[in-house]
Amino acid sequence: MVLSRLAASGLLLLALLALSVDGKPVQQWAQGGWPRPGPEIPPLKVQQWAQGGWPRPGPEIPPLTVQQWAQNWPHPQIPPLTVQQWAQWGRPPGPPIPPLTVQQWAQARPPHPPIPPAPLQKWAPVQKWAPLLQPHESPASGTTALREELSLGPEAASGVPSAGAEVGRSGSKAPAAPHRLSKSKGAAATSAASRPMRDLRPDGKQARQNWGRMVHHDHHAAVGGGGGGGGGGARRLKGLAKKGAAKGCFGLKVDRIGTMSGLGC
């Protein structure tokens, strides 16, 4: 019984206290009459402007570098890169400042005429080269005689037939192949320019063998002199053939003849 009476009296006191106060602390805190706990909370617009989620009223505050450059007079003519970037992207009013590269290019170069638009610019004239020579065309007639002389061999160049040309392996005389020259230099130049050097040789196998003897005259030199030289060379070749050099060519190895003269057997 006693406990129930105490509880009822406590509840009655609390109800009377609430009726006596009735919103007075809230009104006092809003009017500034109550000491606010903690730091002062800014308004909602100020918070949004500080966080960047609300369009900021008034002009945008430039960075510190821009302010220092604007207050530091006299300053260089070209502003720093940070100032240029802020002027181009930070504040839209006012004429845009050209990039740093454009400013340097405009200040370093002398006044130049305006560059015409791309459709008005013409390509440079294409240079015309001289026609190339044909693969077998001879530019001058001086090389024609040299080609004829090389194609006919050393016999035609010297005018005297070699001694080895008259003597074969057995020592018998073989008729030399006649060399026919063209009637005019123009025809010879045309034929020499159109055919390879190998096709211009009118001689046969016997003449090529004589050419090889003349190139390697030290291997085919005769012991005797005069008219007996050819016979001595033939006898020497026969002796070499009997000694086991039959696999060679005129007493020499075939590969050696091929590398030195290019003719072979």
From Swiss-Prot:
Keyword field contains Membrane: no
Annotated SMART domains: NAT_PEP
Tissue: Adult brain regions; ventromedial hypothalamus, paraventricular nucleus, paraventricular organ, and the subcommissural organ. Also expressed by the venom gland.
Substitution effect: P80A: Important decrease in ability to enhance AsS activity
Annotated positions of the Pyrrolidone carboxylic acid modification: Q27, Q28, Q31, Q47, Q48, Q51, Q67, Q71, Q88, Q107, Q121, Q127
InterPro entries: Natr_peptide, Natr_peptide_CS
Propiece residue ranges: 24-26, 44-46, 64-66, 81-87, 100-106, 118-120, 126, 132-215, 235-243
Start-end of Low complexity biased regions: 184-194
Secretion signal, residue range per the UniProt entry: 1-23
Principal subcellular localisation of the protein: secreted
Name of the featured protein: Bradykinin-potentiating and C-type natriuretic peptides
Source organism: Bothrops jararaca (Jararaca)
